[in-house]
Amino acid sequence: GLGKLLNTIKSVQKIHNPNLDIEGLLLTMYDSRLRLSNQVVEEVQKHFNDMVFETVIQRNIKLSEAPSFGESIINYDATSKGATNYLNLAEEIIKKNQ
């Protein structure tokens, strides 16, 4: 799936927007207790090393609940693991682009 997405992006770059660029790959719905989650992280990092954000968004019930209440995770529960993960991602992106 990820390979197809990258091919689609290359096609869009070629035909419509040569300046289109990928900021990075974000791993989401991660659960460290699941072998599959760990295998996916390893495979993605192995194939797309420098493109993968260090921050991983962990599976979290608060992340699932927030959209049901029409709120961002920060507004819904800023102390949740999901909110912390997204704040860490924001910091990582800012540092990367300075």
What are these regions (language model features)?
Residues N88-N97:
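C-terminal alpha-helix
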Residues A66-N88:
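C-terminal boundary of histidine-terminating zinc-finger modules
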Residues F53, Q58-E71, K96:
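Repeat-unit-sized solenoid/scaffold elements
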Residues G1-I61:
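Conserved catalytic-core segment of NTP-binding enzymes
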